[in-house]
């Protein structure tokens, strides 16, 4: 793994998301060695993933190289790897590139998509937590529109142009708005044979209102 031995306390951080990055920034003035593990070598600004999915932004606009973020941080080391196991008694992490001892461990691996027990949503939908997932969604959206552009069967055409978003939280609302903006401002320019009214965007929420985590006022 090629991490230098040190007499300083070694802190291993698993996850280069908001929590992991914020923790490391707060520790930059401390006399410690920090080793960050993440499966990607970039930090993703997740609030803007929907703009990548809707083709409003390119991935490099929301992906920041982790090595660059901490380039001036002394005692910082990054390893792109998956951490498979933690032995808390032996104070050791086991990763896809080897094992490493630690003095302190920070687990900042983020969250997983919650399907709330809905098996159909889990089976047929595409989650949007990472840049690759956002690009997959973008690719499918544009592919469907291309298929609709050459489809003569109206029923099949309608299937290609119907988009369903599960979840009325901030990301779902923003994604629905981005697709609506695409339909209004871009669709007729790039696809003149598809009318705005043909493209449907459905936002599905299990609760009684959208943005339920936010104040009504």
Where are these regions (language model features)?
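FAD-binding core/adjacent interface of flavoenzyme oxidoreductases
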Residues: 1-10, 76-166
